[in-house]
């Protein structure tokens, strides 16, 4: 399971011209689910995302996590994170989880994060337009 996390001052996701999820300060989480992923991996990744210290303290040192800053999450499914880009000029998605498993684990991840912070989401398997203001920019790729 892969999360591309971006520290944002604001982010939103639109589907068919309608905003379906929007946050102020916090993290935009692009979530990719792979074939071998499980609820245990989702638990580990949720814990890591929620506790990853990428927000500035009073000395502007990355020492605080999203919970400590009263931040929010915008979680957006992104199967392309599971792409194999090692060969050729076209990505292979053979490592990606089947849609039913991917949706189940995506929803589970959202639920786990929602136990600790406010979470907004995109729409699974939809064409989405994501806009954000990356604060920093600060972006990390997390994999469990």
From Swiss-Prot:
Gene Ontology CC, one term: cytoplasm
Keywords recorded for this protein, A-Z: Cytoplasm, Hydrolase, RNA-binding, tRNA-binding
One GO-annotated biological process of the protein: D-amino acid catabolic process
Subcellular location: Cytoplasm
Record GO terms (molecular function): D-tyrosyl-tRNA(Tyr) deacylase activity; Gly-tRNA(Ala) deacylase activity; Ser(Gly)-tRNA(Ala) hydrolase activity; tRNA binding
Main location per the UniProt record: cytoplasm
Domain-related comment: A Gly-cisPro motif from one monomer fits into the active site of the other monomer to allow specific chiral rejection of L-amino acids.
Function: An aminoacyl-tRNA editing enzyme that deacylates mischarged D-aminoacyl-tRNAs. Also deacylates mischarged glycyl-tRNA(Ala), protecting cells against glycine mischarging by AlaRS. Acts via tRNA-based rather than protein-based catalysis; rejects L-amino acids rather than detecting D-amino acids in the active site. By recycling D-aminoacyl-tRNA to D-amino acids and free tRNA molecules, this enzyme counteracts the toxicity associated with the formation of D-aminoacyl-tRNA entities in vivo and helps enforce protein L-homochirality.
Protein name per Swiss-Prot or TrEMBL: D-aminoacyl-tRNA deacylase
Organism (species): Mannheimia succiniciproducens (strain KCTC 0769BP / MBEL55E)
């Amino acid at each position: 399971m892969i999360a591309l996390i971006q520290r944002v001052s604001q982010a939103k996701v639109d589907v068919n011209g309608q905003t379906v999820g929007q946050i102020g300060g916090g993290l935009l989480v692009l979530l990719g689910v792979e074939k071998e992923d499980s609820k245990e991996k989702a638990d580990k990744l949720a814990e890591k995302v929620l506790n990853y210290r990428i927000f500035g303290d009073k000395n502007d040192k990355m020492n605080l996590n999203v919970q400590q800053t009263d931040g929010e999450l915008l979680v957006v499914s992104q199967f392309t994170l599971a792409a194999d880009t090692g060969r050729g000029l076209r990505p292979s998605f053979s490592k990606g989880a089947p849609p039913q498993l991917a949706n189940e684990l995506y929803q589970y991840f959202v639920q786990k994060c929602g136990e600790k912070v406010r979470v907004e989401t995109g729409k699974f398997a939809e064409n989405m337009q994501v806009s954000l203001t990356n604060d920093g920019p600060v972006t990390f790729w997390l994999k469990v």
